[in-house]
Structures are given as C-alpha cells and as structure tokens.
Amino acid sequence: MRTLWIMAVLLVGVKGHLMQFENMIKKVTGRSGIWWYGSYGCYCGKGGEGRPQDPSDRCCFVHDCCYGKVTGCDPKDDFYIYSSENGDIVCGDDDLCKKEVCECDKAAAICFRDNMDTYQNKYWFYPASNCKEESEPC
C-alpha cells in the first residue's frame, strides 16, 4: 500500500512531455524514471540545489542545466517528436526548441543508463535539508 501511495504522489506533478521523458528513460535503461529518479539526490525530481551527490544525481543536475539553456518553449510541458532506430533515440522535430528539449532528455536517459551502477538507495527521497552546499555553475 505504501508503494502505491508513493507512486501516486510522484505522478501528481507529471505533465505534458514529462511522460515522454519517462518513456524515454524506460526505453534506454529498462527502469521507470519516475520510480528511480523522481526523487533522488539533490537534483532528480522537483527543484534542485546544492551539489550532486553521485553520478546519477549529476545526470539530473546536467539535465536541469540543459533545460535552463532552452528558449522559446516550455521544456516541461511541450511535446516533442522522437523515435527509436536500431536501439538509439533519434530526436526529430521541425521546432528547434522542442528538438533541444528532446536532446536534453536523451542525454539524461543515456547518462542514467551509463551510471546505473552508481545508484545508491541512500539518496532515494534524500532530504532537501542535506542539499545546502554551494552549487556549482552549469
């Protein structure tokens, strides 16, 4: 029952393209992005401050920085077009901004895959109060 409640809480804030990001993470890693990265470390999930706690958390930090550089659309709400070709994610959209968002998500999904062995359960639902160190620049 507790697991169902946690999943419901994590899904409440998911909008627009964030479900595309979830699907992309699942395709690349075989893991649910919401479950594994929805509230992890200092940067995975809503918000982000302090220093990334490990390489998996750094994937989220870099993803947040990538979103911060996107202009002309809303990275969390706007849908983009992508496909999977020979196991690779291919971002294809006539809208440059949406393509950039897709590329941010693709890079994060690949980063999660490449750092799966660094994932530490102690950073799952990590308290924000532990994320007070000075943040590094993007």
UniProtKB/Swiss-Prot annotation:
Catalytic activity: a 1,2-diacyl-sn-glycero-3-phosphocholine + H2O = a 1-acyl-sn-glycero-3-phosphocholine + a fatty acid + H(+)
Keyword Calcium: yes
Catalytic residues in the record: 63, 105
Tissue: Expressed by the venom gland.
Biological process terms in GO annotation: arachidonate secretion; lipid catabolic process; negative regulation of T cell proliferation; phospholipid metabolic process
Binding locations of Ca(2+): 43, 45, 47, 64
Localization of this protein: Secreted
SUPFAM superfamilies referenced in this protein's UniProt entry, alphabetically: Phospholipase A2, PLA2
InterPro entries: PLipase_A2, PLipase_A2_Asp_AS, PLipase_A2_dom, PLipase_A2_dom_sf, PLipase_A2_His_AS
Enzyme Commission identifier(s): 3.1.1.4
CDD domains per the UniProt record, alphabetical: PLA2c (cd00125)
Domain of life: Eukaryota
Protein name: Acidic phospholipase A2 pgPLA 1b/pgPLA 2b
